UniProtKB/Swiss-Prot annotation:
<dbReference type="GO" id="GO:0032259">
    <property type="term" value="P:methylation"/>
</dbReference>
<keyword id="KW-0808">Transferase</keyword>
<keyword id="KW-0963">Cytoplasm</keyword>
<comment type="function">
    <text>Catalyzes the methyl esterification of L-isoaspartyl residues in peptides and proteins that result from spontaneous decomposition of normal L-aspartyl and L-asparaginyl residues. It plays a role in the repair and/or degradation of damaged proteins.</text>
</comment>
<feature type="active site">
    <location>
        <position position="70"/>
    </location>
</feature>
<keyword id="KW-0489">Methyltransferase</keyword>
<dbReference type="GO" id="GO:0005737">
    <property type="term" value="C:cytoplasm"/>
</dbReference>
<protein>
    <recommendedName>
        <fullName>Protein-L-isoaspartate O-methyltransferase</fullName>
        <ecNumber>2.1.1.77</ecNumber>
    </recommendedName>
</protein>
<dbReference type="InterPro" id="IPR029063">
    <property type="entry name" value="SAM-dependent_MTases_sf"/>
</dbReference>
<dbReference type="GO" id="GO:0030091">
    <property type="term" value="P:protein repair"/>
</dbReference>
<keyword id="KW-0949">S-adenosyl-L-methionine</keyword>
<dbReference type="Pfam" id="PF01135">
    <property type="entry name" value="PCMT"/>
</dbReference>
<dbReference type="GO" id="GO:0004719">
    <property type="term" value="F:protein-L-isoaspartate (D-aspartate) O-methyltransferase activity"/>
</dbReference>
<comment type="similarity">
    <text>Belongs to the methyltransferase superfamily. L-isoaspartyl/D-aspartyl protein methyltransferase family.</text>
</comment>
<dbReference type="GO" id="GO:0036211">
    <property type="term" value="P:protein modification process"/>
</dbReference>
<dbReference type="InterPro" id="IPR000682">
    <property type="entry name" value="PCMT"/>
</dbReference>
């Protein structure tokens, strides 16, 4: 991949990205690692060419198959929550690969990233993009995200990019002691949840309900 493609041109320029990062700061995002990685990650590469000029708007955008690339603010917010609430993050599970953009941020922050996607064409395209960006610390699974990836757990952090009606028990079981789950929960009305597994009583989970959000629904099964 050429430097020109990575840097972007016109609406994907560094100045455009810098304006987005300033908006995120204005909205309360403070983690400098998250902001720096978002500044330097080419979000336009995770969209079809027709939408690439809108990549640095603070809005969700369609990626096909009824899915979306999440609003940059909520991506930054959830990533910041994951980093801030957990201890040392060595291994993270992402539920919902989608475009691969959130995956790319996690892979620059965490040594091991495991990502599960139910829609095969989306994951294939995401894998190709992430490979082009040189990110090699990611493992992929095509499966129902509600079951997580138990064979590879336990995880220091789990981040879900879709909203179930209730938190799946399987995801809670795959958290390591002290592990953190960041997940939107609900139907028409959704709330962002931060759930931490107790380090001593591992049957105990502490839940914080943070703010209203809007995500695509958490669906069961797989699609090809």
């Amino acid at each position: 991949m050429t430097n020109l493609l990575l840097q972007g041109v016109g609406m994907t320029s560094l100045r455009t990205r810098e304006r987005l990062i300033q908006r995120l700061r204005d909205q309360g995002v403070t983690n400098l690692r998250v902001l720096d990685i978002m500044l330097n990650t080419p979000r336009h590469l995770f969209l079809d060419e027709a939408l690439a000029h809108r990549a640095y708007e603070d809005t969700a955008l369609p990626i096909g198959h009824g899915q979306t690339l999440s609003q940059p603010y909520i991506v930054a917010r959830m990533t910041e929550l994951l980093l801030g609430a957990a201890g040392k993050l060595n291994k993270v599970l992402e539920v919902g690969t989608g475009s691969g953009y959130q995956t790319s941020l996690l892979a620059q922050l965490v040594p091991e990233v495991y990502t599960v996607e139910r829609i095969k064409p989306l994951q294939d395209k995401a894998r190709e993009r992430l490979h082009q960006l040189g990110l090699r610390n990611i493992r992929y699974r095509h499966a129902d995200g509600g079951f997580g990836w138990p064979d590879m757990g336990a995880y220091d952090g789990i981040l879900s990019t879709a909203a179930p009606q209730v938190v799946p028990d399987e995801l809670l079981k795959q958290l390591a002691p002290g592990g953190v789950l960041v997940i939107p929960v609900g139907g028409r009305e959704q709330q962002l949840h931060l759930i931490i597994r107790d380090t001593e009583d591992t049957e105990k989970f502490v839940t914080q309900i943070l703010e209203p959000v809007k995500f695509v629904p958490f669906l069961s099964g797989t699609a090809r």
